[in-house]
Curated annotation (Swiss-Prot):
Keywords: Methylation, Ribonucleoprotein, Ribosomal protein, RNA-binding, rRNA-binding. Belongs to the universal ribosomal protein uL3 family. This is Large ribosomal subunit protein uL3. The gene is rplC. One of the primary rRNA binding proteins, it binds directly near the 3'-end of the 23S rRNA, where it nucleates assembly of the 50S subunit. NCBIfam families: L3_bact. One of its GO terms (biological process) is translation. Part of the 50S ribosomal subunit. Forms a cluster with proteins L14 and L19. It holds the Pfam family Ribosomal_L3. HAMAP family: Ribosomal_uL3_B. Methylated by PrmB. It comes from Brucella anthropi (strain ATCC 49188 / DSM 6882 / CCUG 24695 / JCM 21032 / LMG 3331 / NBRC 15819 / NCTC 12168 / Alc 37) (Ochrobactrum anthropi).
């Protein structure tokens, strides 16, 4: 199991495939995606890597997090997330993951926070049909109707679809196809829509329901400079 990545949603556009057909894509950008911490079985009881992406102002970073990033020898990050990995896919602290971590045609699972819609009625929130427009109906055209039972059980069951706050929830879309990547600019183009607004932070992982392509880099696609720095550090430790 490989690590996922953190990316920022830039928006949507379209590209053309070899057949001349246009493909709607969402553009995700990886900016300075570094490993800032490790989790090991010996110390933590499980194996994972903590990634940081983007740049944050030092004055807006807490003292504890400044020390955390300094220990990893990376600049303060705007977003941090942890990913479970198998022991053979554990990455060294300070390593930088590039957009080539994913390959064209690969399926990924994308997680983000959906756009908030505010307080919404049942017709918008749950696709209720509503009541009759006329013929004896008044006031209740867009109402949800009865919500309860009888004297027994004498309550409204939890989870009943009603009006309320819509959106602003954590949403995962599975099996989205990676159309292409651009390592130099740190771009990942995925087919279709991705939950979240422009500028939102998105979690991208290998699809859990589809096998990983054989040409996908393992344990990850690392920046050459970062990989070289790791090798030098390893030689120095020896």
């Amino acid at each position: 199991m490989r690590s996922g990545v953190i990316a920022q949603k830039l928006g949507m556009t379209r590209v053309y495939n070899d057949a001349g057909e246009h493909v709607p894509v969402t553009v995700l950008r990886m900016e300075n995606c570094h490993v800032v911490a490790q989790r090991t079985v010996e110390k933590n009881g499980y194996t994972a890597v903590q990634l940081g992406v983007g740049l944050a102002k030092v004055k807006n970073t807490s003292k504890a997090m400044r020390g955390h990033f300094a220990k990893a020898e990376v600049e303060p990050k705007a977003k941090v997330a942890e990913f479970r990995v198998s022991p053979d896919n554990l990455l060294e602290v300070g390593a930088e993951i590039t957009a080539e971590h994913f390959v064209a045609g690969q399926k990924v699972d994308v997680t983000g926070t959906s756009i908030g819609k505010g307080f919404a009625g049942v017709m918008k929130r749950h696709n209720f049909a509503g009541h009759r427009a006329s013929h004896g109906n008044s006031i209740t055209h867009r109402a949800h109707g009865s919500t309860g039972q009888r004297q027994d059980p004498g309550k409204v069951f939890k989870g009943k679809k009603m009006a309320g706050h819509m959106g602003q929830t954590r949403v995962t879309t599975q099996n989205i196809e990676v159309v292409s990547t651009d390592s130099d600019r740190g771009l990942i183009l995925v087919r279709g829509a991705v939950p979240g607004s422009k500028g939102a932070w998105i979690i991208v992982r290998d699809a859990v329901k589809v096998s990983l392509p054989e040409n996908a880099p393992k344990p990850a696609a690392l920046r050459a400079g970062a990989a070289k720095a790791e090798a030098v550090a390893t030689e120095g430790a020896e």
